[in-house]
Structures are given as structure tokens and as C-alpha cells.
């Protein structure tokens, strides 16, 4: 058969057929009948188009050999025979210029006279059978179907045969000749029987061997075979009564579907108890910075040098005293730790050459604060498995805490603009493709909206602290290293600025596993008097360490400076996530981008510029007891960023659980709002799953209270 095909058909057609088969991973040497069928189909498409032109008056004419200079346009565009990408490009371009509906499958030809796509079929079976299969497959009124058989029969949509009698007769004669040539070589019977119907992918997909055995093993209960399960799934009416479906599925399931109405949901129950306390790894809105502008001192960029320079900008140090003790801690130790930091910084300055890092003396106060020698001694299991009363520590249930107003204030502050820029516009190479141009434009607009945002300051501060702490934990495992908490920014005028927030002292850090803990003591400057919201500072011992002159509208006022000291801990995995906080920028940019995409698809053009530059338009930001809060696009960017940053700063198991479970209730409620008549079963169980995550975490409690505002708003 292969030899016959190569002799019988034009070499160009043979080459196109080989290419088409290779594209689908088929071998012309093996699947010879298919090879012949593809060549035949290609030849019919070319003959269909041959000699048919449209003249200057848009009339259809037949020219077999004439003036090559006549202004003639081919009547048919040949799509069959091109590679897929090119073929779709041609189809798209035809649809765009003529307004014809885009077909779901690649057709064979386009008729410029009748303005329609044509599907050509060549069959070795009954033309009616083949016609119906084609029509069922393409399911389009718009594509014209024309079927030829090797016996001289034909069939076309609405009996409209498109071409004149003579052109069609040429095609039929050629097909008859091919059939006779095959028959004379004894190839026809095999060729005729090899034709299969138009298949859809699912019908062709046969599972055999191991996969078949796995499929049979993994069926739901009560199904004997894959066929039996398939038949059941095919007959499953999606909009029927759900209870019936559930009972069909399994004998054990007896869920009653309850309609979810406006009166169904209740607000989430937030826990009672003392107000929740601050648990972030560093101070947020309460932080105070000692800064130097245009740093140009020797060793600029070395953290310890920068820190000493920043400390020198302040002259109001005084004898420290405790103003808010830590309930459970040995407070004098915190006081001694700060005094030790001051003394050791003074020692560094008295040295000839300032070292690049500073390891603190292992004093009793630091050993206590860093939990040195506090870990219970580890004993090999072999040595103690015979102890009769061996048991795990009883661990106390976490104490419930109520929502406090400070966390909403923290969030509001994170959304605000500062007077410094915390990120530079990345230098990325020239845009090459149009999509890159749009991407750069979006990135630049977004960066402009968030570069001065306080949440961005928290990102850079978090990245710096976590990077420094992880470095020190690996490089100086046994040392109590002093790590300055530093950030860098640019002022409105574009001048560089280095800021010092305070110090961290790291404990022993032999971190083998991702979750092994390194303890640290943080000491951070602040102007916030802890006595105003003592519950927020439950975990801190707060000292008063100096007075600062502040310029105000009424002149200079002196305000006390506080030092917030606490023992804390982190792990390699937490530091890794802290170092990657810049991802929050990407996450919020993607959320904004999906808003732009939605807007663009409605308007059918890229709306990036309008989106950011139309200052009059307001967008929904969130729900509050007052209703839907709206704001400018910049405010939306900053709010989304702040949410992403707080998810990182306050990451916890409670947040994971709350986010996953409350999302289900959120989707049901949105379905109710959109009048989709949702139904639920075991709603009580869902509430239980959500509320078991509401224990004492400030960020989770705030999100739960926002969720209640959203519920109230939807159910109005």
C-alpha cells in the first residue's frame, strides 16, 4: 500500500500527509491505510479548490488556464494540510475579517463566495452514516459539510453542493480511479474495512493492563466494574434531587440537604476572655527608628557599624527603669540585659578597630533570657523504656482570648502611606513582546501605589531581620550574637536613609531540623506608653530608657522613649518564610491583576492605564460594621498587600484552619447572595470546624469579626 500511495499521489500531497501523521505520532509505514486515506482527503480538498476564482466583480468563475495577470482571487482558502498552529492562525484571521463564527474543530476550506467554512469528508462507507457522524462531531450550524464516497455518491448540507456539476464529477471520477487502482492490486478490501467512524477522544480511550486493574480496584463501594460505574456516572442527573443521589452513592450516607436561606447562617462566636496580646516577631506600628540620612561613615553597610552610628544620633539616654513588668518573667534580668548591650557597645567603640560582629558575654541574665540549660535533658529511649510511669507532659489547653481593638489599628496603620520609599523599581531589561509591555506597566503602576506603604516597610524589616538571624544561627551556633534590627529606605527627596529599630540577641542555635527552635531576646525602641493598653504587651517587659525631643505644631515637646524587651523564638522554616516576605508583593499584585483582567475582558481591551489613572472611581475594599468600605485603587492595592503581609507576620495553625474552613461558608454565602439557592448538610459541623480555630490569635479573631460583618451585610 505504501508504494501505491507514493506512485498514485502527487509528491507534495504525500509529504503533507507524512507531516500530518508525524504530528499525531503515527507512522505512515505501519498505518498504511490511514496514510492512503489522508492523501485521498488532501487531494479532494485541493481538487475542490482548483480552478475556482472570484473576479473583480466578486463573481465566481472557473478558469482552467488563462491570463496569469488577470486580477483573480482564489474562491477557497485551503486550511487542510497546514500545520495546526498555522491553520488556526488562518481560521482566526478569516473570522476576524469576515465576522464568521469561529468553529470548534479545524475545518478543511473556507468559501469566500458563500462566506462559510467547509468540512470535506471522503468515506468508504454509506455517505449518510458518515454525514451524520461529521454533523454530530462538529455540532455547528455554520460549517457546511460535503461528503464524497468512492462509489460516486455525495451528500451535502441542505443539498447545497457548492460546486458546479463538472467540478464534482472530476472529484468522483478521481475517487473511482483510486478505488479501481487499489482493487487491481488487491488493496481495496483491506482499505474499505479499515475505516472507523468519526471518534471523539473518550470513545477511543481504552484502559488496559495495570491501569485497568487499578481502575477496577479504586471504584467506589457497590460497583463491580469500570463500565458499570461509567454507566452510572453518565446517567447521573446533576440537577436532580441531591438526597437521592447521596443515598444512591453509599448505604452509610444519610445526609439531609437543608436549604441555606437568609435566616440560616448565624454569626461566628468569638471567644470570651482577657483581650488578646501582640505576638509578632517585631514591633509594627509601635516601632521607633533611630536614623541617619545619606550614610557615608566608614564601614557603611556593615550592620554593627550602621547601628553604632544610629545610636550616636540620639543624646537623651537615661538610667533605665521598668515601667511595665512581664507577669511571669524575672524582670531585673531584662533590665540587666539592656544595660549589658549599652556597655558592650561602648566597649566596641573604645577598641582600635570595630569588629564586624559582636558576641555578647554569656552573663547569667542572658542565659536566663535565652533559656540556656533550660531544655530537659534528653535520655535514650532504650534506657528508660522500663520506667513504669513514663508519660508525656500534660499540656494545658490554650487560654481563650477576646478580640482587642489594637489589632484593627495595627491593620489600618499597615495600609497607610509613610513618607519614605521602601522598595526600588526593579531594573528589568527592555520589553520584547507586547505582553511584557503590559506586565511592566502593571508592575510600575502597582509599585508606585505600594512603595511608600507601611506594609512594605514591614516586608523589608522582616526580610532583613530573618536573613540576619538565619545567617547568625548558622555561622555562630554557640554564640550569643548581637544582631541590629536595621532597614533602609529613601526619603521624599531621594536621599538614602538607614534606620535602627533595636537589637536582637540570639541564643544557642544548633538547628538540625526545620522546626528546631532558636531563642532570641528582642529589644526595640518605641514612643508608645505600654500602660495605655497593658493587655497588648502581656509578653513584654517594658523599660523607660530616655527622653526624645519631638517637633510638634506647638513647638518642641519631650517624650519618654521606651524599650520593649521580650524572649521569643523562631525556627529555620519560619526564618525561610520571613526571608521570602517579598512574595507578599507578588501575591497582592496578582490579585489586582485579576481585577484588571476582569475589567479588560468586559471592555475587550487592556484597561491597565484607565484602571490606575481614573482617580474618581472607588472600589470595594472590605466589610465593616458600617457596610461596604470603598476607596481608591491605591488603597485597594495597599489593603491587599497589608492582608498578605499580616498573613505572613501572624502565620499560625489557627489561621490555616480558619482560612480553609471559613472559605466554605464564604462560598455558600456568596452563592446565596447570587440567588443560586445553595443547600448544605451538617452546617453545625462546619461552624464547629471554623470556631475551633478561634482561640487567642489576634489576626484570626480580627478576620472572624470581618467575616461576621460580611455575613450581616449579605443577609440584610
Swiss-Prot record:
<dbReference type="GO" id="GO:0039657">
    <property type="term" value="P:symbiont-mediated suppression of host gene expression"/>
</dbReference>
<keyword id="KW-0378">Hydrolase</keyword>
<keyword id="KW-0597">Phosphoprotein</keyword>
<dbReference type="GO" id="GO:0003723">
    <property type="term" value="F:RNA binding"/>
</dbReference>
<dbReference type="GO" id="GO:0075526">
    <property type="term" value="P:cap snatching"/>
</dbReference>
<dbReference type="GO" id="GO:0004519">
    <property type="term" value="F:endonuclease activity"/>
</dbReference>
<keyword id="KW-0255">Endonuclease</keyword>
<comment type="function">
    <text>Plays an essential role in viral RNA transcription and replication by forming the heterotrimeric polymerase complex together with PB1 and PB2 subunits. The complex transcribes viral mRNAs by using a unique mechanism called cap-snatching. It consists in the hijacking and cleavage of host capped pre-mRNAs. These short capped RNAs are then used as primers for viral mRNAs. The PB2 subunit is responsible for the binding of the 5' cap of cellular pre-mRNAs which are subsequently cleaved after 10-13 nucleotides by the PA subunit that carries the endonuclease activity.</text>
</comment>
<feature type="binding site">
    <location>
        <position position="119"/>
    </location>
    <ligand>
        <name>Mn(2+) 1</name>
    </ligand>
</feature>
<dbReference type="GO" id="GO:0006351">
    <property type="term" value="P:DNA-templated transcription"/>
</dbReference>
<keyword id="KW-1157">Cap snatching</keyword>
<keyword id="KW-0479">Metal-binding</keyword>
<feature type="binding site">
    <location>
        <position position="120"/>
    </location>
    <ligand>
        <name>Mn(2+) 1</name>
    </ligand>
</feature>
<feature type="binding site">
    <location>
        <position position="41"/>
    </location>
    <ligand>
        <name>Mn(2+) 1</name>
    </ligand>
</feature>
<dbReference type="InterPro" id="IPR001009">
    <property type="entry name" value="PA/PA-X"/>
</dbReference>
<dbReference type="Pfam" id="PF00603">
    <property type="entry name" value="Flu_PA"/>
</dbReference>
<comment type="similarity">
    <text>Belongs to the influenza viruses PA family.</text>
</comment>
<protein>
    <recommendedName>
        <fullName>Polymerase acidic protein</fullName>
        <ecNumber>3.1.-.-</ecNumber>
    </recommendedName>
</protein>
<keyword id="KW-1190">Host gene expression shutoff by virus</keyword>
<feature type="short sequence motif" description="Nuclear localization signal 1 (NLS1)">
    <location>
        <begin position="124"/>
        <end position="139"/>
    </location>
</feature>
<feature type="binding site">
    <location>
        <position position="80"/>
    </location>
    <ligand>
        <name>Mn(2+) 2</name>
    </ligand>
</feature>
<dbReference type="GO" id="GO:0039694">
    <property type="term" value="P:viral RNA genome replication"/>
</dbReference>
<dbReference type="GO" id="GO:0030430">
    <property type="term" value="C:host cell cytoplasm"/>
</dbReference>
<comment type="subunit">
    <text>Influenza RNA polymerase is composed of three subunits: PB1, PB2 and PA. Interacts (via C-terminus) with PB1 (via N-terminus).</text>
</comment>
<keyword id="KW-1035">Host cytoplasm</keyword>
<keyword id="KW-0540">Nuclease</keyword>
<feature type="short sequence motif" description="Nuclear localization signal 2 (NLS2)">
    <location>
        <begin position="184"/>
        <end position="247"/>
    </location>
</feature>
<keyword id="KW-0464">Manganese</keyword>
<keyword id="KW-1191">Eukaryotic host transcription shutoff by virus</keyword>
<keyword id="KW-1262">Eukaryotic host gene expression shutoff by virus</keyword>
<dbReference type="GO" id="GO:0042025">
    <property type="term" value="C:host cell nucleus"/>
</dbReference>
<dbReference type="GO" id="GO:0075523">
    <property type="term" value="P:viral translational frameshifting"/>
</dbReference>
<keyword id="KW-1048">Host nucleus</keyword>
<dbReference type="InterPro" id="IPR038372">
    <property type="entry name" value="PA/PA-X_sf"/>
</dbReference>
<dbReference type="InterPro" id="IPR037534">
    <property type="entry name" value="INFV_PA"/>
</dbReference>
<dbReference type="GO" id="GO:0046872">
    <property type="term" value="F:metal ion binding"/>
</dbReference>
<keyword id="KW-1104">Inhibition of host RNA polymerase II by virus</keyword>
<keyword id="KW-0945">Host-virus interaction</keyword>
<dbReference type="GO" id="GO:0039523">
    <property type="term" value="P:symbiont-mediated suppression of host mRNA transcription via inhibition of RNA polymerase II activity"/>
</dbReference>
<feature type="binding site">
    <location>
        <position position="108"/>
    </location>
    <ligand>
        <name>Mn(2+) 2</name>
    </ligand>
</feature>
<feature type="binding site">
    <location>
        <position position="108"/>
    </location>
    <ligand>
        <name>Mn(2+) 1</name>
    </ligand>
</feature>
Amino acid at each position: 500500500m505504501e508504494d501505491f500511495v507514493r506512485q498514485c499521489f502527487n509528491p507534495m500531497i504525500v509529504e503533507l500527509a507524512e507531516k500530518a501523521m508525524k504530528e499525531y505520532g503515527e507512522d505512515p509505514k505501519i498505518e498504511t491505510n490511514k496514510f492512503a486515506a489522508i492523501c485521498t482527503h488532501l487531494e479532494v480538498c485541493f481538487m475542490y479548490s482548483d480552478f475556482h476564482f472570484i473576479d473583480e466583480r466578486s463573481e465566481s468563475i472557473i478558469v482552467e488556464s488563462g491570463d496569469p495577470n488577470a486580477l483573480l482571487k482564489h474562491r477557497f482558502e485551503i486550511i487542510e494540510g497546514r500545520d495546526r498552529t498555522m491553520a488556526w492562525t488562518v481560521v482566526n484571521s478569516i473570522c476576524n475579517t469576515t465576522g464568521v463564527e469561529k468553529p470548534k474543530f479545524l475545518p478543511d476550506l473556507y468559501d469566500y463566495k458563500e462566506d462559510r467554512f467547509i468540512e470535506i469528508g471522503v468515506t468508504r462507507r454509506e455517505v449518510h452514516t458518515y454525514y451524520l457522524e461529521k454533523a454530530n462531531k462538529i455540532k455547528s450550524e455554520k460549517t457546511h459539510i460535503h461528503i464524497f464516497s468512492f462509489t460516486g455518491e455525495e451528500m451535502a448540507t441542505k443539498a447545497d453542493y457548492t460546486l458546479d456539476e463538472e467540478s464534482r464529477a472530476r472529484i468522483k471520477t478521481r475517487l473511482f480511479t483510486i478505488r479501481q487502482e487499489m482493487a487491481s492490486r488487491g488493496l481495496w478490501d483491506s482499505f474499505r474495512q479499515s475505516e472507523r467512524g468519526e471518534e471523539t477522544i473518550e470513545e477511543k480511550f481504552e484502559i488496559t493492563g495495570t491501569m485497568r486493574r487499578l481502575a477496577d480496584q479504586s471504584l467506589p463501594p457497590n460497583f463491580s466494574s469500570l463500565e458499570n460505574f461509567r454507566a452510572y456516572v453518565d446517567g447521573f442527573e446533576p440537577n436532580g434531587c441531591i438526597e437521592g443521589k447521596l443515598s444512591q452513592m453509599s448505604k452509610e450516607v444519610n445526609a439531609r440537604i437543608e436549604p441555606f436561606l437568609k435566616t440560616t447562617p448565624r454569626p461566628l462566636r468569638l471567644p470570651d476572655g482577657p483581650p488578646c496580646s501582640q505576638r509578632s516577631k517585631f514591633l509594627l506600628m509601635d516601632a521607633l527608628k533611630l536614623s541617619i540620612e545619606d550614610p557615608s561613615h566608614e564601614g557603611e553597610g556593615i550592620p554593627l557599624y550602621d547601628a553604632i552610628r544610629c545610636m550616636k544620633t540620639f543624646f537623651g539616654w537615661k538610667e533605665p527603669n521598668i515601667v511595665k513588668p512581664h507577669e511571669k518573667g524575672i524582670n531585673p534580668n531584662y533590665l540587666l540585659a539592656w544595660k549589658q548591650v549599652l556597655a558592650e557597645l561602648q566597649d566596641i567603640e573604645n577598641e582600635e578597630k570595630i569588629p564586624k560582629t559582636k558576641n555578647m558575654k554569656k552573663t547569667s541574665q542572658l542565659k536566663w533570657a535565652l533559656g540556656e540549660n533550660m531544655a530537659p535533658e534528653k535520655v535514650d529511649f532504650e534506657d528508660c523504656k522500663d520506667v513504669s510511669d513514663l508519660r508525656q507532659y500534660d499540656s494545658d489547653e490554650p487560654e481563650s482570648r477576646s478580640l482587642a481593638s489594637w489589632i484593627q489599628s495595627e491593620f489600618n496603620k499597615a495600609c497607610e502611606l509613610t513618607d519614605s520609599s521602601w522598595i526600588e523599581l526593579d531594573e528589568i531589561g527592555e520589553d520584547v513582546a507586547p505582553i511584557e509591555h503590559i506586565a511592566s506597566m502593571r508592575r510600575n503602576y502597582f509599585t508606585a501605589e505600594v512603595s511608600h506603604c507601611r506594609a512594605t516597610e514591614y516586608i523589608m524589616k522582616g526580610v532583613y531581620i530573618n536573613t540576619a538571624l538565619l545567617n547568625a544561627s548558622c555561622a555562630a551556633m554557640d554564640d550569643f550574637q548581637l544582631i541590629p534590627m536595621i532597614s533602609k529606605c529613601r526619603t521624599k527627596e531621594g536621599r538614602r536613609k538607614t534606620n535602627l529599630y533595636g537589637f536582637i540577641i540570639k541564643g544557642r542555635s544548633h538547628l538540625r531540623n526545620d522546626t528546631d527552635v532558636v531563642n532570641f531576646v528582642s529589644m526595640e525602641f518605641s514612643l508608645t506608653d505600654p500602660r495605655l493598653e497593658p493587655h497588648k504587651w502581656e509578653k513584654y517587659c517594658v523599660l523607660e530608657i530616655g527622653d526624645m525631643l519631638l517637633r510638634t505644631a506647638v513647638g518642641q515637646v519631650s517624650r519618654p522613649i521606651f524599650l520593649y524587651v521580650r524572649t521569643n523564638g523562631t525556627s529555620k522554616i519560619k526564618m525561610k518564610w520571613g526571608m521570602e516576605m517579598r512574595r507578599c508583593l507578588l501575591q497582592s499584585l496578582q490579585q489586582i491583576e485579576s481585577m484588571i483582567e476582569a475589567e479588560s475582558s468586559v471592555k475587550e481591551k487592556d484597561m491597565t492605564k484607565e484602571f490606575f489613572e481614573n482617580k474618581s472611581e472607588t472600589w470595594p475594599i472590605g466589610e465593616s460594621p458600617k457596610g461596604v468600605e470603598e476607596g481608591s485603587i491605591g488603597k485597594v492595592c495597599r489593603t491587599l498587600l497589608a492582608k498578605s503581609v499580616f498573613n505572613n507576620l501572624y502565620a499560625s495553625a489557627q489561621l490555616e484552619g480558619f482560612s480553609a474552613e471559613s472559605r466554605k461558608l464564604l462560598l455558600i454565602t456568596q452563592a446565596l447572595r447570587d440567588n443560586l439557592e445553595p443547600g448544605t448538610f451538617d452546617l453545625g459541623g462546619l461552624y464547629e470546624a471554623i470556631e475551633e480555630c478561634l482561640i487567642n490569635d489576634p489576626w484570626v479573631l480580627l478576620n472572624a469579626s470581618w467575616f461576621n460583618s460580611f455575613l450581616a451585610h449579605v443577609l440584610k
